[in-house]
Every structure is written in C-alpha cells, then in structure tokens.
Amino acid sequence: MQESGLKPILWKNKELILLDQRVLPGTTSYITAKTLEDCIFAIREMVVRGAPAIAITGAFGITLYWNSLVSKPSFSELKLKLSELLESRPTAVNLRLAIEEFSSRFPESNYSSFSLEEIQKGAEELALFMLSEDLENNLTLSKYALSLFPKQPSSLNIITHCNTGALATAGHGTALGVIRSLRDAGHSLTVFADETRPYLQGARLTAWELQEEKIQSFLITDNMAGWVMSSRKIDAVIVGADRIASNGDTANKIGTYPLAIVAKHHGVPFYVAATAKSMDFRIPNGSYIPIEMRKEEEITSFGFLKDSDGKPLLKEGVIAPKGMKALNPSFDVTPASLITGIITEKGIVSPVTEENLKKIFQSI
C-alpha cells in the first residue's frame, strides 16, 4: 500500500513549512512558520486544516515557542500560550489531545525540575512522533477498510465529503486515504466529491488530490448527493471526523449529517474513517461537542478566499443582499444511529455503540 507523495507539513532547519491550502488548486506555495503565533494564524485562517494536520501543526507550534526562549516562562505564562493555541480551532479534539500530551510530559507538579533544554528537546520529539504516528495510523486504518469491499477488483462508486486526504493529515489521509488504498488494491473507482460549501474544501482540495492521483471523479454540489444515490448504485459514503463522542456521535464538516440521512434512506453504507486521536470518551454524546462558528462573509461573498498576500483569489463579489445575516457553523454532528461503521487503526467498529467503541479502544 503506497502513501501519497504529497507532504503538506515539513519540519526543516527548526522551522515549520506548510503547504498553503488557501491558494489551492490555482497555486502551490508554502509558508514558513517561525513562531507559535505563526502556527495559530495558520490554523485559524486555514492555511492548514483537517483535525490531524491541525494537531501536528499545534505540536510544532509549541516546539517553536520553546525554541524561541532563552529562559523558562512561569507555568501560568505557559498555560496562557497553550490556551491561545487551543482556541484557534475548538471543535476537533486532536489539537486538545496534542496539548494535553505535552502538558502530561511536563506537568505543573514538577515543572521546575525540567531545564529549558529538556523541554525544548521533548517538545520537538513529541511533534515529530505525532507526524510519523499519524501517517502510520492512516495506512493501518486503510488496510482494515479493504475488508469492507470485495476482495476481487471491482467497480466501486463512492461519495465523500470535505477533504480527508494527504492535505488534512501527515500525508496519506483518512477517508480519502481509504479511497486511495482501494485504488491501489486494484478496484476501479468513481468518486463523487461534494464541493463542501462554504469553504469549498471538496472543490478546491479533494478534487485536486483526486486529479493528482488520477482517480476518476466527479465534483458535485452538496445538495446533489440524493440525486446521485437515486440515479446510480453507490457502494459507500466515506467521510472523516473531527471528534467522536463516547456513543459514536460524530462531528465532521458541515453537511455530513444530511449526507448520512440521505445515505440511510437509500440503503447506502455510511462509514467514518478516523484515528483514535479523534475519539473523546470524556463526552457522552454529540450534544457536548462545541461547534465552531465562522465568519458570515464565507456565506455571503466570495472575497473570503485570499492568497498569501491577502488578495482575493476570486473576483470580489457579493452573493447575498447587503445586510443579510448568515449562519456559518463549520461542523455538524451525525448521530451514531446513521453510521454503519467507524474505520480506525484499531479495527472497524460496527455497529457503532459506546460498548463497541470502548472495546476496541480499551487501551486509550
């Protein structure tokens, strides 16, 4: 099974180099993050996006913060910096877990016993481990996913939503990684990629990755999924996850929930592909997941997509009457009852229940 050659996150000469996903597919350019503040900006402004990639960027942001110091800050100062990082994108649990992992290695109870050099080294080791671990876990969950489909090469039609490929992870992908692995296993694929309004991750990023991989695909608007399922045989819907509650309720990019409802109506298997880092056993169900609300202009205009110099990528224009208010939740929650199975690096959870999730993740 081959990993994607695309590397959206690079650590080189003690600097973090990020593929600027705001300017894809028209331009391929990288930005260099030299400070924690640079990483927070990159996360908040979606230079980098996707729960795993956000967490990895955050871990390197912590490394950059420590590397910038000549003396240790007070623990209260450190907590403030970590809090600022956590607030950059609140819905995905992966970033919080990365911060908690760092904090567990250098806890307040014996913070004074660690030297500046020890923390600098430990922070970098953690970030590098997260980078390699995510890639390995993505490849492993993709192997498990193959068991859900015919062993013999077949023609498969799959719908996916948002972007869950190399761009959203350390380099292979979750849901899109599964699709890539199905292709590598000899299946003939046709992928229907939702454009994913309003930020167009499907149109700009998933479509680009599919073309790069030479996988036959069609871009569809989010509200075409029902027509596609009713007019041809769809073998599966495969999506990613930003946070999965104890009972299996799953937060993912806005538009996932109605896609699951339509899949249920048409009898199409609906799979979530995610690593253990997206599990949150501290919350009982999806109602406890905070939903990030983004800027109204992402709904009412085209000007929100900007290049690295802050210039609009598309011709500036308003698509709603002046003064029109808009709601812009970045995520919705799909109830576990609509999910056929959750594909993880530990195995496949099906049916999706709290008992089955805890059974497979008992080591967490």
UniProtKB/Swiss-Prot annotation:
GO terms for biological process: L-methionine salvage from methylthioadenosine. It comes from the Bacteria. It catalyses: 5-(methylsulfanyl)-alpha-D-ribose 1-phosphate = 5-(methylsulfanyl)-D-ribulose 1-phosphate. Its EC number is 5.3.1.23. The record marks 162 as: Transition state stabilizer. One of its GO terms (molecular function) is S-methyl-5-thioribose-1-phosphate isomerase activity. This is Methylthioribose-1-phosphate isomerase. The gene is mtnA.
